[in-house]
Amino acid sequence: MSDNLCGGLPPEICEQLNKEEQFIKIKVEKRRYGKEVTIIEGLSGSDVELKKIASELKSKLAAGGTVKNGKIELQGDHRERVKELLMKMGYPESNIIIIE
């Protein structure tokens, strides 16, 4: 991140402020043959950053997944676990919404 976006704040503080401004929605969709897919939307950042987050989630959840159209898709129903992992990554609990 450039210093212009954060007014000269250190990058760590700038990154945390960015995380606090994001509202993340976690939902499950049923796909073909009754397969469930957890969809995480509302994360801002480049495709590279989203792929990094997706990669970390996939390894912690032992699930497959991908990044499509600015959303992370994970195979299976992982709503609660994804919320816990995102909170450990520094996203505030109040900004993470699980859609039933």
UniProtKB/Swiss-Prot annotation:
Alphabetically ordered keywords of this record: Protein biosynthesis, Translation regulation
HAMAP family: SUI1
Top-level taxonomic group: Archaea
Record-level GO BP terms: formation of translation preinitiation complex; regulation of translation; translation reinitiation
NCBIfam families tied to this protein: PRK00939.1 (NF002096), SUI1_rel (TIGR01158)
Taxonomic path: Archaea, Thermoproteota, Thermoprotei, Sulfolobales, Sulfolobaceae
Protein name as it appears in the record: Protein translation factor SUI1 homolog
PANTHER family associated with the record: DENSITY-REGULATED PROTEIN (PTHR12789:SF0), DENSITY-REGULATED PROTEIN HOMOLOG (PTHR12789)
UniProt-recorded Gene Ontology molecular function terms: mRNA binding; translation initiation factor activity
Family membership noted in the UniProt record: Belongs to the SUI1 family.
CDD domains noted in UniProt: YciH_like (cd11567)
